[in-house]
């Protein structure tokens, strides 16, 4: 797996993520792109980029903090087990008024 940024917040450089993804996929490598800086400034086409995962932070697009988006190809999302799920993970719930 490789993880790369789409657009650098330090230099402003836009990386050639499509070309990097094509090369990585030719070697069987999964590609994760950090799109937190790129998403607000670039036109995104996930089918064209062909990355396996693309992460976006909403606060970089003037959204609320603590929210984000993780795009993933269907084949990978179907293989990943949930990290946590449903109410079954709750042992104790109290209401404090």
Regions found by a protein language model. Name each.
Residues 1-95:
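Pyridoxal 5′-phosphate
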